């Protein structure tokens, strides 16, 4: 009898031990899951805390960046779809081309432009032929055989033309293009606008207020120091070099590369052609960029049409001038629209 009772109690104890072990086994994964959730939530809280600190410091040192990005995003969101279907900016380069061919007043400037263009083209073509063409020829012969030599030389002419157009438009011949722009405005009865803007005093930078607190004055002094400007200059330089390098590598693709690079530069090309308009209107760099984002679809349309006209080798001598006239025609349309609103 006692043996039976001991056997029953022993079985009950083992059953209880098994139940406790099963309970602990069931609670183990739950405890691990709970600890993992707590750990992940603590990591998320640390990341969010550091992110908030970074955003706060970014707002302190770059107070205008985030608001400017928000404003430009809203301008894109409101106007892009509407302008992409309604904009007539793509037609102005062709109108300018027709006017340049039919109006002799531009021919003297085009002749001077042609001489400068020829010198720059020969220089860039020689450098390009000595440095990159041998490598491209070797690669093309291995892949395409004798046909590769012909394609490389076509690529050499297209690439040289693209670089020459870029140098002429942005670095060397801006004075000639500014004269062509002003002549076109006068021919379109905008001489009153030119006379007004040329006699207006240049805007001066606002002076510091006398009652400005010392802490604010010291902070602004730190922000305006050269040490603070170095990181921003390095970032901008890195961005420009990366952009230029990527476009250059893209343009090395036979035949198709220069066309793609030409079209990808459409907004930048339009901004370059309208720089004279921004100067005459007295726009700051920020205002000019805001104008670009407000009419970004029109910038793309104008830049693509102007780029196609610039793409034909040696034809660029005429088309850079005609695109400048087209930009002046577009600006005349904008000025007339502003007067109607007034």
Swiss-Prot record:
GO cellular component annotations of the record: ascospore wall; lipid droplet; prospore membrane
A single GO BP: ascospore wall assembly
InterPro entries with a match to the protein in the record: Spore_wall_assembly (IPR052786)
Membrane topology, from the record: Multi-pass membrane protein
Keywords, ordered alphabetically: Lipid droplet, Membrane, Sporulation, Transmembrane, Transmembrane helix
The keyword Transmembrane helix appears for this protein: yes
Cytoplasmic side: 1-109, 153-240, 321-342
Subcellular location: Prospore membrane; Lipid droplet; Spore wall
Main location: membrane
Disruption phenotype: A combined deletion of the LDS proteins RRT8, LDS1 and LDS2 fails to incorporate dityrosine and another yet uncharacterized component in the outer spore wall.
Key word Transmembrane present: yes
Transmembrane annotation, as ranges: 110-130, 132-152, 241-261, 300-320
Extracellular topology ranges: 131, 262-299
Function: Involved in spore wall assembly. May be involved in the modulation of rDNA transcription.
Family classification: Belongs to the LDS family.
Name of the molecule in the record: Outer spore wall protein RRT8
Source organism phylogeny: Eukaryota, Fungi, Dikarya, Ascomycota, Saccharomycotina
């Amino acid at each position: 009898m006692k043996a039976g009772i001991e056997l029953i109690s022993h079985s009950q104890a083992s059953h209880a031990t098994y139940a406790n072990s099963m309970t602990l086994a069931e609670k183990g994964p739950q405890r691990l899951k709970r600890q993992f959730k707590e750990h992940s939530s603590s990591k998320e809280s640390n990341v969010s805390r550091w992110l908030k600190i970074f955003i706060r410091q970014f707002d302190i040192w770059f107070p205008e960046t985030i608001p400017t990005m928000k404003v430009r995003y809203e301008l894109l969101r409101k106007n892009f779809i509407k302008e992409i279907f309604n904009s007539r900016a793509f037609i102005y380069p062709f109108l300018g081309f027709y006017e340049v061919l039919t109006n002799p007043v531009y021919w003297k400037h085009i002749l001077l432009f042609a001489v400068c263009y020829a010198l720059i083209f020969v220089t860039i073509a020689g450098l390009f032929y000595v440095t990159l063409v041998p490598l491209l020829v070797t690669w093309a012969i291995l892949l395409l055989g004798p046909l590769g030599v012909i394609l490389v030389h076509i690529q050499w002419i297209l690439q040289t033309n693209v670089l020459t157009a870029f140098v002429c438009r942005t670095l060397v011949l801006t004075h000639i293009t500014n004269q062509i722009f002003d002549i076109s405005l006068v021919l379109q009865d905008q001489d009153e606008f030119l006379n007004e803007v040329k006699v207006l005093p240049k805007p001066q930078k606002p002076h510091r207020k006398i009652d400005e607190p010392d802490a604010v004055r010291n902070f602004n002094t730190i922000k305006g120091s050269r040490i603070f400007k170095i990181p921003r200059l390095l970032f901008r330089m890195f961005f420009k070099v990366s952009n230029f390098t990527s476009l250059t590598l893209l343009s090395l693709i036979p035949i198709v590369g220069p066309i793609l690079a030409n079209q990808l530069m459409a907004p930048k090309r339009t901004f370059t052609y309208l720089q004279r308009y921004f100067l005459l209107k007295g726009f700051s760099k920020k205002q000019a960029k805001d104008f670009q984002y407000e009419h970004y679809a029109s910038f793309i349309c104008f830049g693509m049409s102007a780029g196609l006209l610039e793409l034909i080798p040696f034809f660029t001598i005429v088309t850079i001038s005609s695109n400048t006239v087209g930009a002046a025609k577009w600006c005349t349309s904008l000025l007339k629209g502003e007067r109607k609103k007034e």
